[in-house]
Amino acid sequence: VIDALVFSCDRAMQLDGLLRSIRLHRVPYRSLTVLAHNWRHTDALAVVEAEHPDVRFVAVDGALPFENEVRWFLATHDRVVFHVDDAVFFARPDPVVLSVESAAVSMQLGRNTVWCRTELGGEVRQKVPPGLVWRWRDADRDFGYPLSINATVYRTEDLLPLMDFDFGNPNQLEGRLHDRRERFGPEWMVCSPHSSCVSLPHNAVSPASLSPRGDNPLWQPEALRERFMAGERLDLGAMDFSRVSGAHQEIPLVFTQAVRV
């Protein structure tokens, strides 16, 4: 049983796309919670909430409420996965792989993910392990990064001992978990032959964000919000996921008017 927590901030178009992709591909989550952090455009958030009545939405402002909600989520669930709202599923993850509890299970990695996006926005080729189960301490780049907050499944009993730190946003949470990776209990990571989820780093909601992002002005948060409020949605069926080769990839966005899946 897996419970999911989605981190979201002012990206209604992308959040809606992620939620619809989870439903479209029958991702087997028991529950789905969206932690909406520091949203300015609450009208857009209200639309997303109305269109996804089966999802729990929690809106918080500030660092401490964010941390408290994450800790409460971890304290009340046994196996969890985090998502950031710029990701989408393009295939159904293998339920057998997801059932592995003794390892960190990545839905963003596979034999197809031969490229790793760097902190400067470029891409470098990474060594893919020969098998679908590998020791992350011996692996390269994304395959040696066990504590991602993007589509990796954990037991909370493995996460909670690491969380002896304060954090106020998803970047701080991931960075400080990564700093403590040598204390992470599971030695192994697991994935399917092909990834099923990909992050689409077309934009960032904070000018202070150091994460690389795309520069297409039509795909920045404000432009996408206007299109979303005008009734447009990501057309998941028309987007081309046939050449996914990394965990993060700027796959072109395609839109349709008020699509529902």
Predicted feature residues:
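Conserved catalytic core of nucleotide-sugar-dependent glycosyltransferases
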Residues: 97-166
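N-proximal low-complexity "stem/linker" segments adjacent to membrane-targeting elements
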Residues: 1-20
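Acidic donor-binding/catalytic loop of UDP-sugar-dependent glycosyltransferases
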Residues: 87-98
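Active-site-proximal specificity loops/subdomain of glycosyltransferases
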Residues: 35-79
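C-terminal catalytic/acceptor-binding lobe
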Residues: 151, 157, 161-261
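Short beta-strand-to-loop acidic/aromatic patch adjacent to the donor-nucleotide binding site
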Residues: 78-88
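Short, charged/polar "capping" segments at the starts of alpha-helices
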Residues: 13-15, 39-47, 96-97, 114-115
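Short, acidic, metal-binding catalytic loop of nucleotide-sugar glycosyltransferases
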Residues: 20-30
